[in-house]
Swiss-Prot record:
Annotated GO MF terms: dynein light intermediate chain binding; microtubule binding
Alphabetical keyword list: Coiled coil, Cytoplasm, Cytoskeleton, Developmental protein, Endocytosis, Endosome, Microtubule, Synapse
Family from the record: Belongs to the hook family.
Protein name as it appears in the record: Protein hook
The keyword Nuclease is annotated on this UniProt entry: no
Keyword Cytoplasm found: yes
Function: Involved in endocytic trafficking by stabilizing organelles of the endocytic pathway. Probably acts as a cytoskeletal linker protein required to tether endosome vesicles to the cytoskeleton. Involved in modulation of endocytosis at stages required for down-regulation of membrane proteins that control synapse size. Not involved in synaptic vesicle recycling. Required in R7 cells for boss endocytosis into multivesicular bodies (MVBs). Has a role in regulating adult longevity.
Segment forming the signal sequence: none
Self-association and partners: Homodimer. Interacts with microtubules via its N-terminus.
Gene3D superfamilies: Calponin-like domain
Regions annotated as coiled coil: 135-440, 484-594
Length: 683
């Protein structure tokens, strides 16, 4: 066991003691991350749940190192989250995060040692830490010492956070950025070295070409010299035609040739030295070329590795982009799910409110049934009012006749008063002329005074006040009723009644004229007494009728107030129901959109149809109930309009009968108008 990997083998021996389903005897079996994930699930099943364990792919044990790297990455991220969230620890920067790629590709023991050290920290700090500590104590002393040293290193590299913050580790984006930066640096360095080597190769090739050219030139010169030497050796005549003589020792030719030979030897030695130097340089250049070729091969291998690293970086970038998109989609789905839950709650509230509205509609139906009974009473009151109107018409015709009679009596009374004044004047004259007959004249005058004052005593002061009050009210009613218009049918009825009354008036006038001619011959005082009695009886009957009409008017006004209150409450309810229906439809539409956005593959047509059917049923029920209430309210409003129109017609008839062409006494005898009519019209 080496000292460098002693801690790793100690941690591996401890890890072998765990009861796991996956194989975990060596580094190759641990490199897929399945055994580590099962161990974490065994340590803290609440944090490393079965759903998390299902994400670890057990098929990564083969040659696919990317699957192993993804499993190890999930394990490392889960461990860091466990340290930050559950244990409330933050790993400092001096503790290097395990290199997942090195473990997955090369089964690096140092990186695997760091990962096992983190797993050991999870085991010692979990809920079942006593049992795991006992298992560690059962190991050998050397293993225990190494495990304790690993725990101490882990404790020194962690610090506890008071706020339970999250571990600050390199994300996928930073990792891809670092890999990209390293790849770019390596690529730039390799390109620089390759350019330098290419430049050196180019220079050496130039030098080699120059040396080869020099070598060929020297060889050519050597051949020329040898040829010249052979020629000179065999020729006895020089170029200038001078005889050179035989080649013998001591001769001039021999000496000249000897001298030339020495020069050639020296040149040959120099050329051989240069050749040796060139050979040495060529060998050096060849060795440099071989070294440069090896360097170029290494650079090509590193470029291939760099290309693979680039591909991996691109894959990581794509995976990070996909992860970002998935995280954004997950956040949107979470928000939509929250909105869907809110919509569910809102729909429940709306259902409860709709149930309340159904109960209220049932109460309104019961109230409508109760008011149906009052409808019959209103019809009875209508019939009674019509009977009273006919009676009132009869009484008004009688009253008109009596008014004409009263006019004739007033004219007679005025004539009698004039005669009285004349008699008073004559009395004064007779007082002066006949003083002796004073007593007799006084007796006669007293009788005449009693006769003349009887007509004035027939009218008491209360009657005069009442007549004045009635006249003022009649004027007010005429002014208030001048701008009102009745319905067409009621106007036709009123016109027909007016024509009947005019015919009755004609007949009454003819009768009055005949009676006036007949009464001129009779005693006026007796007739005035009879007419006054008849007028009193008619006034009493008229007051009784007015009291009855006022009672009916008060009852009708109370019923109208109730009907108006019910109409206002019904209108408010209708507005509330419409507002809630609009809100309900909006909520249903939003719920449909949320369901479609959450999972568009699932056909949510059934739920939408069910909601639409429920909404249609509620709308039909509310429409039927509201239509019944509207019919009832229309009937009551029509009856109320009929009563008001009849009253207006009666008042208009009374106003026509009480025209301005009457005398003072005729206006005084008119019946008092109903006080409630003006108040009801104002309402």
């Amino acid at each position: 066991m080496s000292t460098q990997n002693g801690m790793y083998y100690s941690l591996l021996e401890w890890f072998k003691t765990l009861n796991l389903n996956a194989p975990h005897a060596n580094a190759e079996e641990l490199a897929d991350g399945v055994a580590l994930a099962q161990a974490l699930n065994q340590f803290a099943p609440e944090s490393f749940s079965d759903s998390w364990l299902s994400k670890i792919k057990s098929s990564a044990a083969g040659s696919n190192w990317r699957l192993r790297m993804s499993n190890l990455k999930k394990v490392v991220e889960g461990v860091y989250e466990y340290y930050s969230d559950v244990l409330n620890y933050t790993l400092q920067h001096d503790f290097v995060k395990p290199d997942v790629q090195a473990i997955a590709e090369k089964c690096d023991l140092t990186e695997l040692e760091r990962l096992l050290q983190l797993v050991l920290g999870c085991a010692v700090n979990c809920a079942k830490k006593q049992s795991y500590i006992c298992e560690i104590m059962c190991l050998e002393e050397e293993l225990q010492a190494n495990i304790m040293r690993a725990l101490q290193e882990l404790e020194t590299s962690t610090r506890q956070t008071t706020e339970g913050g999250v571990v600050s580790s390199l994300s996928r984006n930073s990792l891809s950025g670092m890999l990209d930066g390293n790849a770019k640096a390596l690529q730039s360095q390799m390109t620089e070295e390759r350019d330098a080597m290419a430049q050196k190769c180019f220079e050496t090739e130039k030098k080699m070409l120059l040396l080869i050219d020099e070598k060929t030139n020297l060889q050519q010169e050597l051949q020329k010299i040898q040829q010249e030497f052979a020629r000179l050796e065999h020729n006895t005549i020089g170029d200038d035609g001078v005889s050179l003589g035989p080649i013998q020792a001591g001769s001039v030719r021999y000496n000249e040739l000897r001298r030339q030979l020495e020069l050639v030897k020296e040149e040959l030695l120099q050329s051989e030295g240069a050749r040796e130097d060139l050979k040495i340089k060529a060998q050096q250049q060849e060795t440099e070329m071989l070294h440069m070729q090896q360097r170029i091969d290494e650079l090509m291998k590193s470029t291939a590795v760099l290309i693979t690293l680039k591909d991996e970086v691109d894959v990581l970038r794509e995976s990070t982009d996909k992860l970002k998109v998935c995280e954004a989609q997950l956040e949107t789905y979470k928000k939509k799910l929250e909105e869907y839950n809110d919509l569910k709650k809102h729909v429940k509230m709306l259902e409860e409110r709709s149930a309340d509205y159904v109960q209220q509609n049932a109460q309104f139906e019961e109230d409508a049934k109760r008011y149906a009974n009052t409808k019959g009473q209103i019809e009875l009151f209508k019939k009674e009012i019509q009977d009273l109107h006919t009676k009132l018409d009869n009484e008004s015709s009688k009253n008109v006749k009596l008014e004409f009679d009263n006019k004739n009596l007033d004219s007679k009374n005025l004539a009698l008063q004039r005669e009285k004044d004349n008699l008073l004047k004559e009395r004064d004259n007779l007082r002066e002329a006949f003083d002796e007959l004073k007593c007799g004249q006084l007796t006669t005058n007293s009788g005449s005074l009693t006769g003349t004052t009887m007509s004035r005593e027939l009218q008491p002061p209360a009657m005069m006040d009442k007549i004045q009050r009635l006249e003022a009210e009649n004027k007010a009613l005429r002014e208030g009723q001048g701008g009102q218009t009745a319905l067409a049918q009621l106007l036709d009825d009123a016109n027909k009644r007016c024509e009947n009354l005019r015919e009755q008036m004609k007949t009454a006038n003819e009768r009055i004229l005949s009676l006036s001619h007949a009464s001129q011959s009779d005693d006026p005082i007796l007739k005035e007494n009879e007419f006054s009695k008849q007028i009193k009886q008619l006034m009493e009957l008229n007051e009784q009728k007015t009291l009855q009409i006022e009672e009916f008017a008060t009852q009708n006004s109370t019923m109208q107030c109730k009907i108006t209150q019910l109409e206002s409450s019904l209108n408010t309810r209708e507005q509330e129901v419409m507002a809630y229906e609009v809100k309900y439809r909006k909520c249903v539409e939003r719920a449909k959109e949320v369901i479609k956005n959450i999972d568009p593959r699932i056909a949510s047509v059934l739920e939408a149809n069910a909601l639409e059917k429920s909404v249609d049923v509620i709308e039909e029920e509310s429409k039927t109930k509201m239509s019944g209430m509207e019919e009832q309210l229309m009937a009551t409003a029509f009856y109320r309009l009929g009563v008001n129109a009849q009253r207006d017609a009666v008042d208009s008839k009374l106003a026509l009968l009480m025209g301005s062409g009457q005398t003072f006494l005729a206006r005084q005898r008119q019946s008092a108008p109903r006080k409630s009519l003006t108040t009801m019209k104002s309402k």
